[in-house]
């Protein structure tokens, strides 16, 4: 039986804008002599959820409505803000939750996203990224633009300190990162949109290679919310993800979805 991880300080989180702030804590095994997890100091993880409309309405095709209305491009402004404030927020890592663009077949949207994410590439702020349903032709079987603009080579070059590997399949890119915060290493598994059985097997193999690391799973789809504020699984996929992967791994202490 797997040792159960105790991470009480990490289960209560506060989401503020595009940040998640967590108390740092070392993982401790139940029954380990002298193990007494404590809160310690805090650190931040930058979160970029569903930037699709930032990409869409900053293109020439839309007359760059974002610039016209707000005087800036929101996608670019967000990544610049994250880089500029990383030290004061004690932030070593950013994660994108998918839907990088709104219309996968519009070149201009990818150019906007590329320019914004390049700000992270050029900094020492590492990040993970994953495709959402708007980033691909969900009905097609051919490679999609996501692979061109956000390739494994780019991820590796931009994130030399954290990037571990990329699982690449048609319409199903996932990647693994290990980052450190307050002396504790964390494994981030960024799962592509509706990651299939083989992708989940890959993710499980990464966890098995790192049995002592707390795990953060990021995905575009897990839970949903209705107009009355009730939270529920996103179709069958969210429940399957929970039943076949998340609840079977005590190391997973945080799941974020777009």
Regions found by a protein language model. Give the residues of each.
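N-terminal active-site segment of His-dependent metallophosphoesterases
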Residues: 29-108
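Extended active-site neighborhood of metal-dependent phosphoesterases/phosphodiesterases
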Residues: 63-66, 105-201
């Amino acid at each position: 039986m797997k040792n159960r991880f105790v991470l009480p300080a990490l289960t209560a989180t506060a989401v503020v804008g595009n940040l998640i702030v967590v108390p740092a804590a070392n993982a401790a095994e139940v029954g380990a002599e002298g193990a007494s997890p404590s809160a310690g100091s805090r650190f931040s993880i930058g979160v970029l959820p569903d930037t699709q409309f930032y990409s869409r309405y900053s293109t020439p095709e839309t007359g760059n409505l974002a610039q016209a209305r707000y005087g800036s491009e929101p996608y670019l402004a967000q990544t610049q803000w994250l880089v500029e404030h990383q030290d004061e927020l004690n932030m070593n890592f950013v994660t994108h939750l998918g839907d990088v663009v709104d219309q996968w077949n519009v070149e201009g949207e990818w150019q906007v996203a590329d320019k914004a994410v390049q700000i992270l590439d050029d900094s020492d702020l590492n990040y993970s990224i994953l495709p959402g349903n708007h980033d691909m032709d969900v009905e097609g079987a051919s490679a999609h633009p996501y692979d061109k603009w956000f390739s494994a080579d780019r991820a590796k070059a931009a994130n030399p300190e954290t990037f571990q590997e990329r699982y690449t399949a048609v319409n199903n890119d996932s990647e693994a990162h290990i980052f450190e915060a307050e002396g504790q290493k964390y494994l981030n598994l960024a799962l592509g949109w509706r990651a299939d059985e083989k992708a989940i097997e890959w993710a499980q193999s990464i966890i098995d290679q790192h049995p002592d690391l707390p795990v953060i799973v990021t995905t575009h789809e897990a839970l949903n919310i209705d107009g009355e504020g009730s939270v529920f699984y996103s179709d069958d996929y969210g429940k399957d993800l929970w039943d076949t992967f998340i609840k079977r791994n005590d190391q997973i202490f945080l799941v974020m979805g777009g």
